[in-house]
Regions:
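Ser/Thr-rich, low-complexity intrinsically disordered terminal regions
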Residues: 2-197
Length: 198
């Protein structure tokens, strides 16, 4: 079986280490705003209503983006697996632009939160990005899309020389207890946000 369609051949790093941690010479508000703006350049516009307020109550600046569409992704994946698109993409992995890869993205959530670094007077922060990554697609276009977006985010911070330390990738086991990005914590925040909208 071609690695393009192999579950074993997929890059599982996003599933195993869904947390990205940046330490930046930006305020928490600036860092979150830049990250959200970056995602919006890829036509990601939707936020979970009320999550900004819930993160603020937990002591963080942040939000939750809603990305992708299951029905659209299923159709795009079905077409690709039965066409020459997959063969072309395997031979030329960068041939498909991000706007095409985005069509393969199933519904996922991206949490973006930040808080000041201790002793920085609020002028530096740690920015956390969590990708709630799931996929039932047979192709790797969804993985490629996320890898491209997140890679370009890191590059933008590097080019602006605002990174204070190398990017960290963490697993769920490595998540500090005071970071509200566990599944139970997020579930509680979403429920509270939904309740407040009523």
């Amino acid at each position: 079986m071609s690695p393009l369609f192999s579950h074993i051949g997929r890059n599982l790093s996003m599933a195993k280490q869904p947390f990205m941690v940046f330490r930046l010479s930006l305020t928490p508000d600036e860092a979150v705003a830049r990250c959200v703006t970056h995602w919006r350049t890829f036509k990601i516009q939707s936020e979970t209503p009320g999550m900004r307020e819930q993160f603020a109550l937990a002591g963080w600046v942040g939000t939750e983006l809603v990305i992708g569409n299951n029905g659209k992704a299923f159709l795009a994946d079905a077409i690709a697996t039965s066409s020459a698109t997959a063969a072309v993409a395997e031979l030329f992995p960068k041939a498909l632009p991000d706007r095409v890869r985005r069509a393969f993205v199933e519904k996922n959530f991206v949490e973006i939160i930040a808080r000041p670094l201790a002793g920085s007077g609020g002028r530096m922060c740690e920015l956390w990005c969590r990708l709630d990554y799931t996929s039932t697609n047979e192709t790797f276009f969804q993985e490629d899309f996320f890898a491209s977006v997140l890679g370009k985010l890191e590059q933008s911070f590097q080019s602006d020389q605002v990174m204070l330390a190398p990017l960290e990738h963490l697993s769920s086991r490595e998540l500090p207890t005071d970071v509200p990005l566990t599944l139970p914590a997020l579930r509680a925040l979403r429920q509270a946000a939904k309740k407040n909208r009523r």
